[in-house]
Amino acid sequence: MVKSLANTQEKFWKGVFGIKYKSRNESTILKTSNKFFFKKCLKKTQKNKIKSMIEFGPNIGLNIIALQKILKLKKIRGVEINKIAYENLAKLKDVEAINKSVSSYKSKNKYDLVLSKGFLIHINPNQLNQTYKNIYNSCSANGYILIAEYYSPKPVAIDYRGNKNVLFKRDFATEMLKIFKKKINLIDYGFAYHGDKHPQDDLTWFLFKKNG
């Protein structure tokens, strides 16, 4: 049953809806607001030590583009399930694009920054623990993990543009802190409001540092 649900979700994002999602991510406003968003999120990091990053579910790479303007990144990887979005991602300068689902991806490399923005909300809840482990294992010692997702104190499934079982809100940060107790520390968090001068989609973000 778990496998069936996971496959349904992966097919959903691989298919036509994933392509439409790619089109919605081409907003000029979003490109501008992302830069301001990440500057705020990374205030408490040692930016000069962030030389590499990986993003899970980057779509066409707008987050990566914004971070390239803020950080001096030498190694960048994006793991994207949708083929069309992946092809766009692969065209970005200095980006290694991987066309896989997070469930089938295993990282041998470590990165100074691991990013999930609007990604965990689309993962089958029964696969979250493994996804958390993939995120943690991809992070270098003393590296940073940044997650920006829709928040709910209790797990809840939300209809997403008329589709069921493709969007789930919950307290991702607390779950990660419980799983990786004493292995990661929460060093900053905040909220991005859709009505801000540089709007985001009402995301709650959390910045962790992995212990060395």
What are these regions (language model features)?
Residues M1-S52, F56-K106, I123-Q130, N134, ...:
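Class I (Rossmann-like) S-adenosyl-L-methionine-dependent methyltransferase catalytic domain
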Residues L115:
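A conserved beta-strand element that flanks and buttresses the S-adenosyl-L-methionine
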Residues F119:
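Hydrophobic adenine-recognition pocket in adenosine-nucleotide-binding enzymes
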